């Protein structure tokens, strides 16, 4: 389906609108560049404005969380359908990944967390719910 979600876990900007907004901390020209360094073309930058929703039910799914975040893609981690012990293990694992990557973790709702790669700012979360970083 062209223009729609890539898979059942991808979310479009329209679906995300009104919940929170993920934006880069600085513009692409804000940092000094090394000699010969090329900036990302604007079209590719816009394509990176997506995030992935991962509904984790078993601990083995935690690897998807880490791999997605390591690729620089924000993850909306939904643990609402996981058993309590599995949810605790996945959250503990995800917290370690976030810490290791110097990323951010924001609580969106009970058992729902937004994991953001380094250099990402989250706007629009309810005050007192989001905790920038770990």
From Swiss-Prot:
GO CC terms, sorted: cytoplasm
Name of the gene this protein is made from: sepF1
Subcellular location: Cytoplasm
GO biological process: division septum assembly; FtsZ-dependent cytokinesis
Keyword Hydrolase appears in the UniProt entry: no
Name the UniProt record assigns to this protein: Cell division protein SepF 1
Entry keywords, A to Z: Cell cycle, Cell division, Cytoplasm, Septation
Major site of localization recorded for this protein: cytoplasm
The UniProt record lists the keyword Cell division: yes
Pfam families listed in its UniProt record: SepF
Family: Belongs to the SepF family.
Subunit and interaction comment: Homodimer. Interacts with FtsZ.
